[in-house]
Curated annotation (Swiss-Prot):
One of its GO terms (molecular function) is protein phosphatase 2A binding. Coiled coil: none annotated. It is found in: Cytoplasm. Residues 64-364 are annotated as: Required for interaction with PJA2. This is Malignant fibrous histiocytoma-amplified sequence 1. It comes from the Eukaryota. It comes from Homo sapiens (Human). The keyword Oxidoreductase does not apply. The lineage of its organism: Eukaryota, Metazoa, Chordata, Craniata, Vertebrata. Probable GTP-binding protein. Functions in innate immunity and more specifically the inflammatory response as a regulator of the Toll-like receptor TLR2 and TLR4 signaling pathways. Negatively regulates the part of the TLR4 signaling pathway that leads to the activation of the transcription factor AP-1. By retaining the phosphatase complex PP2A into the cytoplasm, prevents the dephosphorylation of the AP-1 subunit JUN which is required for proper activation of the transcription factor. Both inhibits and activates the TLR2-dependent signaling pathway. Interacts with RAF1. Interacts with HSPD1. Interacts with PPP2CA; retains PPP2CA into the cytoplasm and excludes it from the nucleus. Interacts with PPP2R2A; the interaction is direct. Interacts with PJA2. Its main location: cytoplasm.
């Protein structure tokens, strides 16, 4: 049915209910289902050609059978004696076979047959004699065939009540159709009609009509003759206007007018007082149709993807509204009266320009489906709105209790390669110092030239850029060393200003992809539409001409990269459009077709993503700003630029967000002595601070949740291990992360030796006096620690007690260490290697694995820790392999974090730098990452398993949770373009270097009914079992986002 794939409408239930009614009537009949001997199960019209048509023999004694199902048998003829043997038959199902015409034997059943289903065949004609004989027929399904016309004899079926001729090639309908006076349901969608068939105007009993996806371009004025019509589908009918007579269809209850060219509705539209469901999505409405406001009985209203700029206050008159979709318009504000729609259960507002939600929004407490992303929200803040209506209600309640407060504070991130000059630039900006002060300058802030400061990893500084306006920057200096790449994405967040620092003294055009291009791709993938300023440092080391040429080259190559990416995405979007223009049946007919077998719903999702990527390109400020830290004019110009951009309300609306004063006070109290020095606070400690801020316990939760979402502190209400603690000291946490990601063996060994010198003297511990160690003991201890450092840098392995030594003095008590390790595991940075799930370690040493440190490319058995070994993989019949491809950029640290995320799903694992061998139960799985090899071979990440064909469900069961975990992680990169494919099992078995790739969207679709095998396009003689392409049950393509720790402290 038209629109069934949209997933946005509940109207599918209308057709489902009709099917259930028919099934209920059939349930009292004596039924029989037959399968042809030797036939491939489900070898229907869409299946492969078989050498011989399967034969089906009727059993004896069929005289009492009233319902016979011969569907999914690949039949070209019905069995001999069908008509004479079935004297009582009332229902005959022949769907999904290979009939080119209605079998003559069907005519013999005409005097008692009431229901006939010949859908999904190859009918090009019906046969006048056969149709004439079906005089008792009440229900006829001819959908999904190749019929160019219908015979006139169809009009003689006086008892016909339901007729489905959708998905055919009908250019017109026979005049005799007007004689079907009892017809209640007619489906003609997806045909080739060029005008509304006037014959239908005579069908006074018609209640349900679908003429979607035909090029009608208009409706007749006298369509009002269809007075019994209750359900009308006109989706994608190329309608520009509705005639006044349309408004006389007074019985209409459900109306689908989506995907047309409507700009307005007739004033008389308000006469449709029985209307309960209306879909006007994907039209050209610039104003909310006033004619809808008097429709007091309306329950569902869809106005997605129009050009609306406002919603009228009189919408509150739609008091029975349960569903309201207004997404992807240009709405700037909502009327206060919208909160009176207290019965709303679905409210979709994403993709608009809404900055402020009305007061008392929490009254919409019944809303379950809530979408608000991609709006410039200020009040409530974006982080609050994304949590849902209860959190919005708590925010507004708190705002009413305490005076509002505005905090102009912007996150500024300095990015760039190692030695780009980020740290020196940060010092000069935040301390307002000038190195050397050539040509004058403020002597009080003038410092003699000094060696470039050495970065200590990721550093955070607060910078009051303009005290008079109270404007502050929180400056994050992101380390340029590759070892920090796994944690850098945690700090890339919406609402921040990105400064990409390039060393102009060493820059060469051929190095653009690594010094500039890759950083832009990275930020764009993580934070679509981010604001980026390019700053060139060491300008004093370049000649005037050289400086100009290098800045112009960076500017030119950025423009070329953006143009290349946008054109590539446009081409891909065009392929999706072309696929959507073809019928699903046509797409599914040939594996050679683009997006073979992909549903309209998945194609529309794909198209929407491409459109999102095209509409949310990076905002790159031009031109490149050359800076020398020795020139106060350069620094002043850079400061002025940053301030002018920061104060632009349309670019950074969050800078002006309004908070309850009590929430701001709670934040400030967390950072005052004595608690400011502690690594974490208990929930009760925070509750006591909340009372000082005027927050009762029931109001504290929302405040902590906001501070967590906005990156001020970490509070994991969804984690049993962490929910009783609040991590407020983010500076110390970053210092701890820096310890793990400085890959200097001498520095690590020095920290361990310092840690051992104070061992046994930690706070809260007591120990007897220790004798001074002998030189030989000191040497032995140093040797052991050196081995631990080597194991860490080569294999990413550290025992818990060594981690404690490494983190002194940051971690003192054992509880600090345990909480910190739980936190690192939640961030996806490490996992406990030998801890039984849900059980204590019974005194044995806990070992932790940091996958980003693994150096050996091929996994090896770690039997020296867990006593297991990975047996060699034996030959098996069939392979499953899901491959993710990343054409533009591969997310930083994704493989390492994914390695941690899957740990709870696998056992007996062995890790390499780019590969993981493991088991799901007794089923082997292999996760592999292959870095890009040039422009034409992108980065890929694959998940594979294998099993014999009868047991292939076990392989699907093994890899499906791993696929879903990867999908969850990729949700953190909304601007990332990637593709998913199922690799052909036959190609893999042959060892093909370039196996055929079936579309990954098939993973989220049910197996096609009646299809047993699929042709591999790489080799037309190869047939792939459908079980090797489609999972037993569809996977979750867009799983609900899990709480990610890394997401939270990146949002400050």
């Amino acid at each position: 049915m038209a629109g069934m794939d949209s997933g946005n409408l509940k109207t599918a239930r209308l057709w489902r209910d009709a099917a259930l009614r028919a099934r209920k009537l059939r349930s009292n009949l004596r039924q029989l289902t037959l399968t042809a001997a030797g036939a491939c199960p489900g070898a229907g019209a869409d299946a492969l050609e078989s050498p011989a048509s399967p034969q089906l023999v009727l059993p004896a004694n069929l005289g009492d059978i009233e319902a016979l199902n011969l569907g999914n048998n690949g039949l070209e003829e019905v069995p001999e004696g069908l008509g004479s043997a079935l004297g009582s038959l009332r229902v005959l199902v022949l769907r999904r076979n290979r009939f080119a015409r209605l079998p003559p034997a069907v005519a013999e059943l005409g005097h008692h047959l009431t229901e006939l289903d010949v859908s999904h065949n190859r009918l090009t004609a019906l046969g006048a004699e056969v149709v004439s004989a079906l005089r008792e027929l009440r229900k006829l399904n001819l959908s999904h065939n190749q019929l160019p016309a219908l015979p006139a004899q169809l009009g003689a079926l006086a008892h016909l009540e339901e007729l489905d001729v959708s998905f055919n090639r009908l250019a017109h309908l026979p005049d005799s159709l007007s004689c079907l006076s009892r017809l209640r349901t007619l489906d003609v969608d997806h045909n080739q009609l060029t005008a509304f068939p006037r014959q239908l105007l005579q069908l006074v009993a018609l209640e349900e009509l679908d003429v979607s996806s035909n090029r009608l371009r208009g409706l007749p004025e006298d369509i009002s003759a269809l007075r019994a019509l209750k359900i009308l589908w006109l989706s994608g009918a190329e309608l520009g206007t509705l005639p006044a007579g349309f408004c006389e269809l007074a019985s209409l209850e459900s109306l689908m007018l989506d995907n047309n060219g409507l700009q307005a509705l007739p004033a008389q539209f308000s006469c449709l007082q029985r209307l309960k469901m209306l879909n006007l999505s994907s039209n050209l409405f610039e104003e909310f149709p006033a004619a809808l406001l008097p429709l007091a009985g309306l329950e569902e209203l869809y106005l997605s993807r129009n050009q609306l700029t406002s919603v009228p206050s009189l919408i509150s008159g739609l008091g029975r509204l349960l569903t309201l979709w207004l997404d992807n318009n240009r709405i700037r504000y909502l009327p206060d009266s919208i909160v009176e729609l207290t019965g709303l259960e679905e409210l979709v507002l994403q993709g608009n320009q809404i900055a402020v939600l009305p007061d008392h929004f929490g009254q919409l407490s019944r809303v379950g489906l809530w979408k608000i992303k991609d709006n410039p929200l200020i009040q409530p803040p974006y982080e609050v709105c994304m949590k849902g209506i209860p959190y919005i209600a708590a925010y507004q309640k708190e705002l009413a209790h305490s005076q509002p407060a505005v905090q102009p504070r912007l996150k500024l991130l300095l990015m760039g390669h190692k030695a780009a000059g980020k740290t020196l630039l940060r010092h000069c900006l935040t301390e307002e110092r000038v190195e050397g002060c050539p040509g004058g300058g403020d002597k009080e802030k003038c410092y003699p030239p000094s060696p470039p400061p050495v970065s200590k990893g990721i550093e955070v500084t607060s910078w009051t850029a303009d005290a008079s306006r109270g404007l502050r920057f929180i400056v994050y200096d992101l380390a340029g060393d590759e070892s920090y790449e796994v944690i850098q994405p945690f700090f890339l967040s919406p609402g921040a200003l990105y400064v990409l620092v390039v060393n102009l003294a060493t820059y060469e055009p051929r190095h653009f992809p690594t010094t500039v291009g890759s950083f832009l791709h990275r930020v764009g993938a993580r934070v679509p539409h981010a604001v980026v300023c390019i700053v060139g440092t060491h300008a004093d080391l370049c000649g005037e001409r050289e400086l100009e040429e290098k800045c112009l080259d960076i500017h030119r190559q950025i423009a070329l990269q953006e143009k290349h990416d946008a054109e590539g995405l446009s081409r891909l979007a065009k392929v999706v459009d072309e696929a959507l223009a073809r019928d699903f049946e046509l797409r599914s007919a040939s594996p050679h077709a683009a997006y073979y077998g992909v549903s309209d719903k998945n194609l529309r999702r794909r198209k929407a993503h491409f459109q999102y990527l095209l509409n949310h390109r990076l905002q790159i400020l031009s031109p490149v700003l050359p800076v020398s830290c020795r020139d106060p004019r350069h620094l002043r110009r850079l400061r002025d630029k940053l301030l002018s951009v920061a104060e632009h309300r349309e670019i950074f609306p969050n800078l002006h967000r309004v908070l309850p004063r009590s929430w701001q006070v709670l934040e400030e109290l967390h950072f005052q002595p004595p608690q400011a020095q502690r690594l974490w606070l208990s929930w009760w400690d925070s509750a006591r601070l909340g009372l000082q801020a005027g927050l009762t316990e029931d109001r504290l939760q929302s405040a902590l949740s906001y501070l967590h979402e906005s990156g001020k502190l970490l509070y994991f209400e969804d984690s049993p291990a962490l929910k009783e603690h609040v991590f407020h000291n983010l500076t110390r946490l970053i210092d701890i992360l820096n310890v793990f990601f400085q890959r200097d063996p001498s520095l690590l060994l020095h920290k361990l030796l310092l840690g051992t010198s104070g061992e046994g003297k930690a706070e809260g511990e007591s120990s007897p006096p220790m004798a001074r160690s002998t030189p030989s003991q000191e040497l032995l201890r140093a040797t052991q620690l050196h081995q631990y450092v080597e194991g860490f840098l080569l294999h990413g392995l550290l025992p818990a007690h060594v981690i404690r030594l490494l983190l002194k003095p940051h971690v003192q008590a054992q509880q600090d260490l345990q909480l910190l390790l739980e936190l690192l595991e939640k961030m996806g940075l490490c996992y406990c290697l030998n801890k039984p799930k849900g059980k204590p370690l019974n005194g044995s040493t806990a070992w932790y694995k940091f996958p980003c440190y693994v150096q050996n490319e091929v996994p090896h058995a770690e039997a020296w820790i867990n006593g297991t070994n990975l047996a060699g993989q034996s030959f098996v019949a069939e392979q499953l392999q899901i491959e993710y491809s990343f054409p533009f950029t591969f997310p930083l640290g994704l493989f390492a974090r994914y390695s941690v995320q899957i740990n709870s799903h696998v056992v007996h694992r062995s890790d390499g730098k780019f590969q993981i061998f493991a088991y799901r139960g007794k089923v082997p799985v292999v996760v592999s990452y292959r870095p890009a090899r040039g422009v034409l071979q992108p980065d890929t990440l694959s998940i594979a398993s294998h099993a014999s064909l009868p047991n292939i469900w076990t392989a699907w069961q093994a890899i499906t949770p791993l696929v879903e975990e990867l999908n969850v992680l990729l949700q953190e990169w909304p601007g990332l373009h990637y593709t998913v494919h199922i690799l052909c099992s036959k190609c893999l078995k042959r060892g093909s270097p370039n196996p055929h790739a079936f579309p990954g969207e098939l993973l989220s679709q049910p197996r096609p009914e009646g299809v047993a095998e699929i042709i591999c396009p790489k080799n037309g003689s190869e047939r792939v079992n459908v079980a090797l392409v489609y999972p037993p049950t569809p996977t979750v393509i867009s799983p609900c986002s899990k709480k990610n720790v890394g997401e939270k402290h990146r949002n400050q």
